[in-house]
């Protein structure tokens, strides 16, 4: 939940992977700089199990001059905002619908939009519109736009959610 709605809550220092999981994750996209770790965590969530040790074994080393790639400065924030859409596209590969329903149980109850494999882009778009992050909201709206423009998909949305063009018009309010 936190990875999708907020920010990366996991670190990769000392990350251990089984070879078969590693081979599914790599290579990471060259064009993604700040969110490579987060993308990897999302992919691991989709294809395997995450085990987090309770004991802190490793400490991050931070430079005082804020020159490292993850330093909190304006260029890092800009880069992260620009990478958000590519990062969220990672969720479109999810095939564990039950897991998505567990992750977003509060939003599913609030919106009455349940996940189905055939409506995954729409579902994730609706979930992103529930985020506080405007870049995630824009991504969500764009995914819904792309999905809804197809007449067959519009029919599926009506059948599963009673979603109409009137509902579609209201979604822009979530980005305002």
Which residue ranges define each predicted feature?
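A generic structural signal for short hydrophobic patches within well-formed alpha-helices
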Residues: 21-23, 41, 58, 67
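Short aromatic/basic micro-patch
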Residues: 15-16, 52, 59-61
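Exposed loop/turn and edge beta-strand positions of beta-sandwich/beta-sheet ligand-binding modules
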Residues: 11, 34, 56
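Acidic donor-binding loop at a coil-to-helix junction in glycosyltransferase catalytic cores
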Residues: 33-42, 79
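C-terminal subregions of glycosyltransferases and related glycan-biosynthesis enzymes
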Residues: 46, 56-176
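A recurrent flexible, glycine/aromatic-enriched loop bordering the glycosyltransferase active site
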Residues: 1-17, 84
């Amino acid at each position: 939940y936190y990875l999708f709605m907020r920010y990366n809550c996991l670190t990769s220092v000392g990350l251990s992977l089984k070879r078969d999981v590693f081979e599914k994750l790599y290579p990471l996209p060259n064009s993604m700089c700040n969110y490579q770790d987060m993308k990897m965590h999302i992919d691991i969530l989709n294809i395997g199990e995450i085990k987090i040790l309770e004991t802190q074994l490793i400490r991050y080393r931070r430079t005082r001059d804020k020159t490292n790639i993850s330093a909190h400065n304006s260029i890092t924030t800009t880069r992260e905002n620009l990478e958000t859409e590519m990062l969220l596209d990672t969720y479109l590969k999810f095939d564990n619908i039950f897991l998505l329903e567990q992750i977003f149980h509060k939003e599913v109850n609030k919106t009455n939009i349940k996940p189905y494999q055939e409506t995954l882009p729409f579902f994730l778009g609706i979930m992103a519109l529930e985020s506080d992050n405007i870049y995630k909201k824009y991504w969500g709206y764009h995914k819904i736009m792309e999905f809804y423009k197809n007449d067959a998909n519009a029919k599926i949305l009506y059948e599963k959610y009673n979603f109409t063009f009137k509902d579609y018009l209201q979604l822009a309010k979530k980005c305002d």
